[in-house]
A protein has these predicted regions:
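C-terminal lid/capping helical subdomain adjacent to the catalytic/cofactor pocket in oxidative enzymes
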Residues: 2-18, 39, 130, 365, ...
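Helical element adjacent to the flavin cofactor pocket in flavoenzyme catalytic cores
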Residues: 151-209
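Flavin (FAD/FMN) cofactor-binding core of flavoprotein oxidoreductases
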Residues: 134-138, 304-314, 319-397, 427-431
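Beta1/beta-strand and adjacent pyrophosphate-binding region of the FAD-binding site
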Residues: 12-28, 44
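Flavin-dependent oxidoreductases
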Residues: 31, 188-316, 328-339, 344-355, ...
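Glycine-rich FAD pyrophosphate-binding loop
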Residues: 37-57
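Dinucleotide-binding Rossmann-like beta1-alpha1 core, especially the glycine-rich loop
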Residues: 61-139, 256-259, 266-279, 283-304
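Short beta-strand to alpha-helix junction loop
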Residues: 74-77, 103-113, 151-170, 180, ...
Length: 442
């Protein structure tokens, strides 16, 4: 079941030529298109389904610096500023509010890791506070659990996934971006060894630069052009509750439940580090690369072989551009939610917060997260194909840092001074044989 999502209209006419084509209408692609157009570039955004239809509307809606890997902290910090700027520019509410993020733990070892992280973050201008049990009780007087400590970052925020990407798309369109939904990119044409056009199901767009922000579909698109991009797919579950008392105005994370206050008075609810790994021929191909990641996360993961496994074997990784592509057979990935996770999270939430005893699950949904082996995204040119750029593999972090990731991608595409140092996000690290392991601290 797909979660609620504000829908936008498409531009009917496909341009014959633009400066940049952006493939993918999630938060990253829309943000990149917005920043490219603001710099005066002509931009067409093509999306096989509808804007925000996949993970950008299925995530938790957290916009956080807290707990980010060192490599992502600069991007997360810039993203919060850009959320405000882009929301104001759009003139449409994306639901962004700076309401803080709070983590709680029952583990002394985990608390110690948070203290170490807070010290590193402080050096990078992110100010988080380690909380004592007494301070937690003061913040959450109705919570009946016993905690050894917490971590709070008041400058962090939240946004509404159902509203955010459509709002950003409205801002992008205001600056001249054309948006084409139900328009799958089938592949790239090249001239003289560099990108010269994008072939879509509705026609060809000539261009000298293409940014692929295709999320779970990015690896398959790259393989069609002989480009290696190790991406694993994890199906995750979230839900929304009926309205209830405001036990937090922002986001709260524990081992037993994670919540975000919604504008409708309910909560977005989920369990962290839980999901189902979708086994695929590509994942077996990259099994050695992903092995350290699997060992790190295996306690929260299930393994599944679905019909897509066999479909990929039959389909292969090559197709003709004059016939329907794999991207046209599944317009929107809509995995079923794991209701055992939903029920466990709700039971834990109510047990720890009795004042929420009357809330119920209003809706649950699944989504597919595109994960890299080190859980750091790829925002980078592809050296093997000049004119081709990637902004993908956000590993469940993309929504919150989306505005800054899009800005960085736009900077890289145009050769501008980058928003932050892009070295950590290089495509090269994915294919040069180095050992990749998760760097997210918690």
């Amino acid at each position: 079941m797909s979660p609620p999502l504000n829908r936008i209209n498409s531009d009917e006419r496909l341009p014959a030529q633009v400066d940049v084509v952006v493939i993918g209408g999630g938060v990253i692609g829309v943000s990149a298109a917005y920043h490219l157009a603001k710099k005066g570039h002509s931009v067409a955004l093509v999306e096989k389904g509808h804007v925000g239809g996949e993970q950008s509307s299925r995530n938790w809606g957290w916009c956080r610096q807290q707990g980010r890997a060192r490599e992502e902290i600069p991007l997360a910090r810039e993203a919060l500023r850009l959320w405000e700027d882009m929301q104001n520019d759009a003139g449409v509410d994306a639901g962004f509010r700076r309401t803080g993020v709070l983590f709680l733990t029952k583990s002394k070892d985990e608390l110690a890791s948070w203290e170490r992280w807070a010290a590193v973050a402080r050096e990078m201008q992110v100010h988080s506070t380690v909380l004592t049990p007494a301070e937690i009780a003061e913040r959450m007087p109705g919570n009946t659990d016993t905690w050894v400590g917490g971590l709070h970052t008041p400058s962090d925020g939240r946004a509404e996934p159902s509203m955010a990407v459509p709002a950003l798309a409205a801002a992008a369109r205001k600056h001249g971006v054309t948006i084409h939904q139900g328009c799958a990119a089938r592949g790239l044409e090249t001239t003289g060894g560099r990108v010269s056009a994008v072939v879509t199901e509705k026609g060809t767009i000539r261009t000298q630069a293409v940014l692929l922000s295709g999320g779970a579909w990015s690896s398959l698109f790259c393989r069609r052009h002989g480009i290696e991009l190790p991406i694993g797919l994890v199906n995750a579950t979230a839900c929304r509750t009926t309205p209830g008392p405001e036990i937090t105005s922002g986001a709260l994370g524990t081992d037993f439940y994670c919540i975000r206050r919604r504008l409708d008075g309910g909560f977005t609810l989920a369990l962290r580090n839980r999901g189902t790994v979708e086994l695929s021929p590509d994942l077996f191909r990259y099994a050695r690369t992903f092995w350290p990641t699997y060992l790190h996360r295996k306690n929260g993961l299930k393994l599944s072989i679905g019909t897509s496994f066999f479909e990929q074997i039959v389909r292969g990784t090559s197709w003709s551009f004059d016939k329907p592509s794999p991207f046209e057979t599944e317009r929107v990935r809509d995995p079923a939610p794991d209701m055992s996770l939903v029920n466990a999270a709700l039971a834990s939430l109510i047990k720890a917060n009795p004042e929420l005893k009357d809330i119920e699950i209003a809706e649950a949904w699944g989504g597919t997260i595109d994960c890299t082996p080190d859980t750091i995204p790829v925002i980078s040119p592809v050296d093997a194909l000049p004119g081709f750029f990637l902004a993908t593999g956000f590993s469940g972090h993309g929504f919150g840092i989306g505005p800054a990731a899009g800005k960085l991608a736009a900077d890289i595409v145009t050769g501008a001074t980058p928003l932050v140092d892009p070295a950590a996000y290089s495509h090269k690290r994915m294919i040069d044989g180095r050992r990749l392991a998760p760097v997210s601290p918690f």
